[in-house]
Regions:
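N-terminal Rossmann-like dinucleotide-binding module
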Residues: 11-44
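Short acidic low-complexity segments
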Residues: 72-85
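Rossmann-fold dinucleotide-binding core
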Residues: 151, 155-226
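Glycine-rich phosphate-binding loop and adjoining beta1-alpha1-beta2 segment
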Residues: 33-67
């Protein structure tokens, strides 16, 4: 790469999961809409055909009249080919297939355990991690061997364990994880400012927050707008909308698999005094017992949904059809940013403007009362010198036990996956607050789910 007139040219980005029909398209749009970077994106995917399809789509986006930078998209046949010479590595993969995820999400329902997402914690999150961690061992080793100085951006869930595995295998890796859940809570605060004070068109980025926690279970203990403390306004709003909830935009929780009425957020704030900063579907899965997920009827009372794998399979077919339309020109390309910040973080690391954003990185003291090497979600400063976490301060005493339980479970999940330790795996599985079963029931469910994901497990699990 080289610099010319406040632009960086001849960059190489390796995209692992380059056949993605979601994250990849958004990333391509963001690159095309930014004039300060250009180069090559090497698409690597075990589904080679999907990568070939995205090569066509990516080059169409780059050639669009509204594109303000030029990127060349190519297909890499191997990880080595993709990674060699890379300045940045982006990872967004589906670990396994939706058939395995069907077991992750729905097998526990036979035991009265309902999951709204099933990709981070709970029984489903644990099993997804068992598949994902071996894949990330391979990816980390390849980055170590072929692009040790590249910056690595992860989008895959379970986010915490993906980033934790990368650092465990290659401690000198320069990796961080990006998640947009915090953005959604900042956006909620802009709407509350409109509703309560008539302040319209407040930008999400103007809501300044202190972020602390772990991915999908993050908290704000400070939130301001132009120096104004937003906590009193949020408390008033949460009390007024506790029963009804609050939604904005064109979707609502009854017709969207991802939407919610924010009742879980309001409830958590009134219980604990901090703003829970993720979607209700994610937050619910971290809480003890059956607080929000006792039954489908209880979930409806809290005004969010259980995202079924059947819905995901149908939505995949829609994305496959859209891929075809984009490739053939039946659907015109429209250049528009997707709201993510990955490309902006790249620019900051290249020296094209400092940026503070929430990311998932090793703790290293940012949250004083969580383990040093645990991966946490906090604000960090991005610039030419690298990534420096902002000291978030300790978690409040009433929230710490909720978060710490998952932190230690995640550490044990990593160890169990790396060592194929069935005993540690089972005890970690049973220690999740959503697994409200007796020992025999829990072991039966664990064995069933492990069997259902066996195609992606190291052979030592069957020893």
């Amino acid at each position: 790469m080289y610099y010319e007139d406040n632009r960086v040219k001849d960059l190489k980005v390796a995209y692992i999961g380059g056949g993605s029909r979601g994250w990849a398209w958004g990333f391509m749009m963001d690159l095309a809409a930014d004039a300060q970077m250009e180069g090559t994106v090497a698409l690597y995917d075990i589904d080679h055909e999907a990568a070939e399809h995205n090569e066509i789509i990516g080059n169409k986006i780059s050639a669009h009249p509204d594109a303000v930078s030029h990127w060349k998209y190519t297909v890499a046949d191997t990880l080595q080919q993709a990674l060699t010479g890379a300045d940045f590595v982006v990872i967004s993969i589906l670990p396994g297939t939706f058939d395995e995820m069907e077991s992750d999400v729905h097998a526990p329902e036979a035991y009265g355990i309902y999951q709204s997402v099933g990709d981070t914690v709970g029984a489903g999150g644990f099993m997804r991690a068992m598949r994902t961690i071996p894949m990330y061992v391979t990816i980390a080793e390849a980055i170590r061997d072929y692009s040790p100085n590249a910056w690595v951006i992860n989008y895959t869930n379970p986010m915490t364990l993906c980033v934790r595995t990368l650092y465990h295998v290659f401690p000198k890796i320069k990796a961080f994880g990006c998640c947009h859940e915090v953005f959604g809570t900042q956006t909620l605060l802009t709407h509350i400012l409109d509703e309560e004070l008539g302040l319209k068109d407040v930008a999400r980025q103007d809501i300044k927050v202190n972020v602390k926690g772990i991915n999908h279970f993050t908290w704000f203990d400070k939130a301001t707008y132009k120096g104004m403390d937003l906590f009193p306004i949020y408390r008033k709003f949460a009390e007024e909308h506790y029963e009804s909830g609050y939604e904005y935009g064109d979707t609502n929780w009854m017709n969207s698999s991802f939407a919610c009425a924010n009742r879980v957020k309001f409830d958590l704030f009134l219980r604990y005094g901090c703003i829970a900063a993720a979607g209700d579907r994610h937050l619910a899965e971290f809480m003890p017992g059956k607080t929000y997920l006792e039954s489908p009827e209880a979930v409806r009372e809290w005004k969010f949904g259980l995202t079924t794998v059947a819905w995901r399979k149908n939505e995949l077919q829609e994305r496959l059809a859209r891929s075809r339309r984009l490739r053939t020109g039946e659907e015109p390309i429209e250049i528009k940013p997707d709201g993510e910040e990955g490309h902006l973080l790249m620019k900051a690391l290249l020296g094209l403007g400092d940026l503070v954003s929430n990311v998932n990185i090793p703790n290293h003291g940012a949250i004083a009362n969580l383990p040093w090497d645990a991966v946490v979600e906090v604000n960090a400063l991005f610039n030419r010198q690298g990534v420096q976490s902002v000291n978030a301060g300790p978690l409040p005493a009433n929230i710490l036990p909720l978060v710490a339980r998952h932190v230690y479970n995640q550490e044990n999940t990593l160890t169990a996956a790396l060592t194929c330790d069935r005993t540690l795996g089972l005890t970690t599985f049973m220690n999740d607050p959503q697994v409200t079963l007796n020992w025999n029931q829990g072991k039966e469910l664990f064995d069933t789910m492990l069997h259902n994901t066996r195609a992606y497990l190291p052979k030592e699990w069957n020893a």
